[in-house]
C-alpha cells in the first residue's frame, strides 16, 4: 500500500474538486469545500505543503478512501 505524503495545497484542492466538492468561500488562507451529502465542510489551508495529518483528516471528513485518494491523485 502506498504511503500518503505531504502535497501542495493546489493538488489537494484539485483532488477535492474531482471528488465533487465545490469551493464556497475562503477564510484568510483557507479554502472551504462542501458537497451535498457530506455533513461537514472540508477546510484546506493554502500552504506550500499540506501535512499528512491534515490530508488524512480531510479524507475522513470527505468520506474518501485511501484507494480513491491515490486514484484521484494520479489524475491531477
What annotation goes with each model-predicted range?
Residues 22-56:
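A short, structured beta-strand/loop element
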Residues 51-76:
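C-terminal structural segments of small proteins and small subunits
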Residues 3, 40, 69:
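Glycine-rich, flexible loop/turn motifs
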Residues 1-27:
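N-terminal first-folded block
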Residues 2, 45, 59:
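Short, flexible active-site loop motifs that bind/organize anionic cofactors or intermediates
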Residues 17, 27, 49, 68-71:
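Glutamate identity and glutamate-enriched acidic tracts
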Amino acid at each position: 500500500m502506498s504511503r500518503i505524503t505531504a502535497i501542495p495545497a493546489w493538488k489537494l484542492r484539485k483532488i477535492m474538486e474531482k471528488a465533487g466538492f465545490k469551493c464556497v468561500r475562503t477564510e484568510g488562507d483557507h479554502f472551504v469545500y462542501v458537497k451535498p451529502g457530506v455533513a461537514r465542510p472540508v477546510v484546506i489551508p493554502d500552504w506550500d505543503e499540506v501535512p499528512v495529518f491534515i490530508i488524512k483528516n480531510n479524507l475522513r471528513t470527505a468520506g474518501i478512501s485511501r484507494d480513491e485518494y491515490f486514484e484521484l491523485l494520479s489524475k491531477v
